[in-house]
């Protein structure tokens, strides 16, 4: 691998440039998304609009974009004949995309809940727990190996997050920060005003629908009474598991078998179709959602921030798809850590976030654990990455390594023996 890269420095430099560019785009979009979710809330840290409308619109934007590009790809490669007939196996492969779509659907909804309870800085710090869940699924689902240093760094990361949670007990009353006042695009109609006036306590029905009752934790357990777990902490742990499962399964079906050589835009079209389906069912089956859309309209409560959030969420999802297709999950998780630094800085400057001394002492431990994990990639033969070779429909031979961060590589020798094994 190294010799091939050295013999083609131009190709290597372009690959590195594209990798850094993709990572930078993902970081910018992820940071913008968190900030826009926070800015789109009202003064009470609730949402005047239905968050599901943001998700269904972003899925629609992604689907339209991918379908248009897919038609261009199919027309260019003269593959229109593949659209005429569909076997049972193709239908089964198509239905596989419903699983990550459903998980992404849950993940995108939980984000709105989390930021109703936590400061953006605290949310991104606690989201580092996804490194642990992703590493576990890496080992179980994708059969990727981790050495003992990496496992130790994951344990340190977990303990750092627990300590950080305990250190925020003095900020529980103001974790969500302050809300914002902004003008909506559409003024409510008479039927909408009547609908809102009929809500209990003259409150916004949407706001009541999208909040959890206050929960008190550790009221009986004295051993862990100093750890102040709130609803926001529980939700973000659940989100870490869901997002890790979604990304791991998505990477698996993006790269398995013949899917490896299929266009990413065709694959994403299947994923986003189910995304629209699940979000649309949520809007249609939930009575409160139907009543609000019927009386106030689909875009009631939306502002410039929520409209911008639709497009940022869409393009952030596309960037994740490119990372999972051409890189891997660990690159995605490690790039997300840069978002932690950005959001923490913005929270101090904008959201009136005042970190305590414990925060400054414990937050670097989280980032240090991440650095140790990334710097301790196994180099010994025991953990050598497994090589897979796949031939596409045009006869080109491709090679993919299962190691962290390895990219898909085309083998240029047309008559190379596929049974030969590379030595490392």
From Swiss-Prot:
Keyword annotations of the record: Antiport, Glycoprotein, Golgi apparatus, Membrane, Phosphoprotein, Sugar transport, Transmembrane, Transmembrane helix, Transport
Gene Ontology process terms (BP): transmembrane transport
Transmembrane segments annotated in the record for this chain: 9-29, 54-74, 94-116, 120-142, 148-168, 229-249, 264-284, 304-324, 331-351, 355-375
Annotated stretches, region: Disordered: 397-424
InterPro entries for this protein: Nuc_sug_transpt
Reaction it catalyzes: UMP(out) + UDP-alpha-D-glucuronate(in) = UMP(in) + UDP-alpha-D-glucuronate(out); UMP(out) + UDP-N-acetyl-alpha-D-glucosamine(in) = UMP(in) + UDP-N-acetyl-alpha-D-glucosamine(out); UDP-N-acetyl-alpha-D-galactosamine(in) + UMP(out) = UDP-N-acetyl-alpha-D-galactosamine(out) + UMP(in)
Name of the protein in its database record: UDP-sugar transporter protein SLC35A5
Biased composition (Basic and acidic residues): 408-417
Main localization category: Golgi
Side Cytoplasmic, residues: 1-8, 75-93, 143-147, 250-263, 325-330, 376-424
Modified residues (Phosphoserine): 394, 416, 419
Originating species: Homo sapiens
Compartments where located: Golgi apparatus membrane
Entry superkingdom: Eukaryota
Function noted in UniProt: Probable UDP-sugar:UMP transmembrane antiporter involved in UDP-alpha-D-glucuronate/UDP-GlcA, UDP-GlcNAc/UDP-N-acetyl-alpha-D-glucosamine and UDP-N-acetyl-alpha-D-galactosamine/UDP-GalNAc transport from the cytosol to the lumen of the Golgi.
Molecular function per GO: antiporter activity; pyrimidine nucleotide-sugar transmembrane transporter activity; transmembrane transporter activity
A UniProt-annotated Pfam family: Nuc_sug_transp
Entry similarity comment: Belongs to the nucleotide-sugar transporter family. SLC35A subfamily.
UniProt membrane topology term: Multi-pass membrane protein
Any GO CC annotation of this UniProt entry: Golgi membrane
Assembly and binders: Probably forms homooligomers and heterooligomers with SLC35A1, SLC35A2, SLC35A3 and SLC35A4.
Residues carrying sugar: 204
Lumenal side: 30-53, 117-119, 169-228, 285-303, 352-354
